[in-house]
C-alpha cells in the first residue's frame, strides 16, 4: 500500500499572486516586467525532475504585494477552498514585502487545515542570473508535496519558505530588504531546515485532529490602526488616532516588554477608548521577546486602561488576527478574549 502510494505522484497547486518572483528582466534596458505563469516556470526546468504533478492558477492582473489587502486574502483562500480535495498541497507565490501579513491572515482563515499551504517568493526576479527564486520555489513545492508513511502531509499548516528555512507563517517577519535570508521567525523555531537533506522538526509542527474539516472564514474588518509609541509622542497625536471615525481596534507598538510613557494623559485616552468599545492590543517593537505587562511600572497603566497583551505575537500576525476577529465577532469582549489566546500557534502564553 505504502509503495503504491509512493508511486503515485503528489499534486501541488501553485497560486501566483505577483511579486518579484514573477518578474523578468528586459535584456535591452534591464527594466523589470511581469511574466505569465508559463514564462516563470520555463526559467525553472528542474521542476520536471520533481516527482510532483504541478498545476497553477494566477491572479489577473498580478499585483505588487504593497497593494495587498484583505480581499486578496479572500481570493487566495478561495482558490484553496475550491481545489482543496484535488491537491495534496498549495504553494502561494507572493511579493516579499507583505508576505508575512498574508501568511498570518491565511493561517486564521483556514480552520481545520490538514494540507500544506506554503508561501514563498524571492529577492531577485526569476529571470535574473543569481535569483533565489529557483531554490525557494523548488523547495516549497517539494515540502508541499511531502507525505509521511501514513500518507499524511508532513507539514499540514500555513508556512513560509525562504532561504532554506520553512517557518510557521504567522510567526514570520521580513527582517532584511536586501539579503536572500530575508525572513525570520524570532519567537518560534523552524519547522524544516532544507540543507543537503530536508530536516523536519516534527515537534514544532502543528497537526489538526484526524476528523478536522476545512472551514474557510472570509470576513475581515480593517477598521484598525497601528500606533507606534516613540519618545516625545504628543497627546494630540494619540487623541487624533483614537478619534478616527469607525475605529474598532489599535495595535499599540510599545517599548521593550510592553512599556509606554507613564504620563496620565496616555492612560486616560486609552481608558476612554476602551470604555467606548475600542480594543487596544500591546505588541512590542522588538523583533524578539514578549510583552509582559506589569513587569515594569511603565506598563501598569496600560493594564488599568484595559489594554490586551499580545504576548510574543508579531506585528504582522497581530494586524491580521485583529482584522479576522473583528470580522468574526461584533462584541468587543469576544475580540479581547480571543486576541489574548493562541488560535493557530501565533503566540506563546
Across the structure, where does each feature detected by a protein language model lie?
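Short acidic, glycine-rich surface-loop motifs adjacent to enzyme active sites
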Residues: 87-99, 245-258
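Short beta-strand segments
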Residues: 15-17, 92-94, 118-121, 159-163, ...
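C-terminal non-catalytic interaction/assembly regions of soluble proteins
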Residues: 257-349
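ATP/NTP phosphate-donor binding region
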Residues: 2-82
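Short glycine/serine/threonine-rich phosphate/pyrophosphate-binding segments
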Residues: 23-24, 98-103, 133-137, 259-262
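Short Gly/Thr/Asp-enriched flexible loops that form oxyanion-binding sites at enzyme active sites
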Residues: 92-115, 262-269, 298
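Internal gly/pro-rich beta-alpha loop/helix module
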Residues: 119-195
Amino acid at each position: 500500500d505504502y509503495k503504491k502510494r509512493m508511486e503515485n505522484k503528489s499534486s501541488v497547486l501553485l497560486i501566483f499572486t505577483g511579486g518579484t518572483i514573477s518578474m523578468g528582466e528586459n535584456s535591452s534596458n534591464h527594466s523589470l516586467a511581469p511574466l505569465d505563469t508559463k514564462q516563470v516556470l520555463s526559467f525553472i526546468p528542474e521542476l520536471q525532475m520533481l516527482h510532483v504533478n504541478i498545476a497553477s492558477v494566477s491572479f489577473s492582473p498580478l499585483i505588487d504585494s504593497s497593494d495587498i489587502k484583505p480581499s486578496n486574502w479572500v481570493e487566495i483562500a478561495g482558490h484553496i477552498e475550491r481545489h482543496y480535495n484535488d491537491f495534496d498541497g498549495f504553494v502561494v507565490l507572493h511579493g516579499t514585502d507583505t508576505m508575512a501579513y498574508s501568511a498570518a491572515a491565511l493561517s486564521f482563515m483556514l480552520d481545520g487545515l490538514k494540507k500544506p499551504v506554503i508561501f514563498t517568493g524571492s529577492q531577485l526576479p526569476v529571470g535574473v542570473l543569481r535569483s533565489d527564486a529557483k531554490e525557494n520555489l523548488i523547495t516549497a513545492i517539494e515540502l508541499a508535496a511531502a507525505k509521511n508513511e501514513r500518507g499524511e502531509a508532513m507539514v499540514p499548516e500555513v508556512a513560509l519558505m525562504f532561504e532554506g528555512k520553512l517557518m510557521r507563517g504567522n510567526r514570520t517577519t521580513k527582517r532584511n530588504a536586501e539579503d536572500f535570508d530575508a525572513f525570520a521567525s524570532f519567537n518560534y523555531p523552524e519547522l524544516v531546515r532544507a540543507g543537503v537533506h530536508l530536516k523536519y522538526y516534527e515537534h514544532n509542527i502543528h497537526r489538526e485532529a484526524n476528523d478536522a474539516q476545512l472551514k474557510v472564514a472570509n470576513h475581515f474588518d480593517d477598521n484598525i490602526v497601528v500606533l507606534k509609541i516613540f519618545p516625545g509622542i504628543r497627546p494630540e497625536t494619540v487623541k487624533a488616532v483614537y478619534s478616527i471615525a469607525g475605529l474598532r481596534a489599535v495595535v499599540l507598538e510599545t517599548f521593550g516588554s510592553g512599556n509606554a510613557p507613564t504620563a496620565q494623559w496616555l492612560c486616560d485616552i486609552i481608558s476612554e477608548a476602551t470604555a467606548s468599545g475600542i480594543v487596544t492590543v500591546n505588541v512590542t517593537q522588538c523583533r524578539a521577546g514578549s510583552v509582559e505587562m506589569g513587569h515594569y511600572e511603565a506598563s501598569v497603566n496600560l493594564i488599568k486602561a484595559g489594554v490586551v497583551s499580545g504576548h510574543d505575537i508579531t506585528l504582522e500576525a497581530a494586524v491580521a488576527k485583529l482584522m479576522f476577529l473583528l470580522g468574526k465577532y461584533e462584541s468587543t469582549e469576544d475580540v479581547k478574549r480571543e486576541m489574548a489566546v493562541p488560535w493557530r500557534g501565533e503566540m506563546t502564553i
